[in-house]
């Protein structure tokens, strides 16, 4: 097993421990954030997924549109 594979396994374990679940429809690991507003609740979906050997963090708003995306270095996210 390569160092990259070990880092990915540790990263996935870390995000699972932080409330993410694998979501087939997004082909990545997701969790929902929710906040109260004067008009009700707003939700956003946070997704970590691997796309062509690059891990990405993607945030979707209540309307389903992407409002943030970033390529990430998984080693910076490991404890």
What are the functions of these language-model segments?
Residues 21-77:
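Acidic, low-complexity, intrinsically disordered interaction modules
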């Amino acid at each position: 097993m390569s160092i990259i594979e070990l880092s990915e396994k540790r990263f996935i374990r870390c995000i699972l421990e932080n409330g993410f679940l694998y979501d087939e429809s997004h082909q990545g690991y997701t969790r929902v954030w929710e906040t109260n507003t004067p008009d009700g609740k707003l939700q956003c979906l946070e997704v970590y997924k691997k796309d062509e050997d690059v891990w990405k963090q993607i945030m979707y708003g209540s309307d389903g549109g992407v409002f943030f995306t970033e390529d990430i270095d998984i080693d910076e996210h490991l404890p």
